[in-house]
Curated annotation (Swiss-Prot):
Protein name per the record: 4'-phosphopantetheinyl transferase
Catalysed reaction, written as an equation: apo-[peptidyl-carrier protein] + CoA = holo-[peptidyl-carrier protein] + adenosine 3',5'-bisphosphate + H(+)
Pfam family for this entry, one: ACPS
This protein's UniProt keywords: Antibiotic biosynthesis, Magnesium, Metal-binding, Transferase
GO biological process, one term: antibiotic biosynthetic process
Cofactor names: Mg(2+)
Function field: May activate the peptidyl carrier protein (PCP) domains of surfactin synthetase SRF1/2/3 and iturin A synthetase, by transferring the 4'-phosphopantetheinyl moiety of coenzyme A (CoA) to a serine residue. Required for the coproduction of the lipopeptide antibiotics, iturin A and surfactin.
Spans through the membrane: none
Enzyme class: transferase
EC identifiers of the protein: 2.7.8.-
Length: 224
């Protein structure tokens, strides 16, 4: 397993954007051109290039020659590399990517105040009870731990919104370990949280417990 990250401390330069646009597919270029905000296009480009760079490094490929497909529920994959599973997430200034030999999910969330009201609608009764039991000063922090863990689980399962958020429960214990109450018939999986930034929560869900130790940071130059 590998986790790669890029922190956007500045916008892409015109030259960097042009080189990345030249490496991605025509469909991705068109998607980037349709974004109203340039930073959204840059996040999309960087996420695409993170995957290309990871695949190229692992398999000795030309990054620009990699083609992507889409599974039934919209999860991207590389048809030529059936043993390479990956997932991308971005929020705020962060773009992260997880790569493994088995299905994997990753989610990063920038924390914002005043968002925990949606917990009762989307979280399981167990999760909502855990959240309510936290001190008010800790509730936003724990809410985003729950949200990122649940999103990583759904992305690992690869079933999109067909898997309701309240159909399973996750719990972050005081020692940092995560317990999961799985939906009926679901394959075993494991979740770990990572420290990316004090303003963000990051979680990875994998089919095995052998997580990597941390995030391997990449610069714009390393993606070109």
């Amino acid at each position: 397993m590998k986790i790669y990250g890029v922190y956007m401390d500045r916008p892409l330069s015109a030259g960097e954007e042009d080189r990345m646009m030249a490496a991605v597919s025509a469909e991705k270029r068109e998607k980037c051109r349709r974004f109203y905000h340039k930073e959204d296009a840059h996040r999309t480009l960087i996420g695409d290039m993170l995957i290309r760079t990871a695949a190229a490094k692992a398999y000795g490929l030309d990054p620009a020659g990699i083609s992507f497909g889409v599974q039934e529920y919209g999860k991207p994959y590389i048809p030529a590399l059936p043993d390479m599973h990956f997932n991308i997430s971005h929020s705020g200034r962060w773009i992260v990517c997880a790569v493994d030999s088995k299905p994997i999910g990753i989610d990063i969330e920038k924390m914002k105040p005043g968002t925990i009201d949606i917990a009762k609608r989307f979280f399981s009764p167990t999760e909502y009870s855990d959240l309510q039991a936290k001190h008010p000063d800790q509730q936003t922090d724990y809410f985003y731990h729950l949200w990122s863990m649940k999103e990583s689980f759904i992305k690992q399962a690869g079933k999109g919104l067909s898997l309701p958020l309240d159909s399973f429960s996750v719990r972050l214990k005081d020692d940092g370990h995560v317990s999961i109450e799985l939906p009926d018939g679901h394959e075993p999986c494991f979740i770990r949280t990572y420290d990316a930034d004090e303003e963000y929560k990051l979680a990875v869900c994998a089919a095995h417990p052998d997580f990597c130790d941390g995030i391997e940071m990449k610069t714009y130059e390393e993606l070109l």
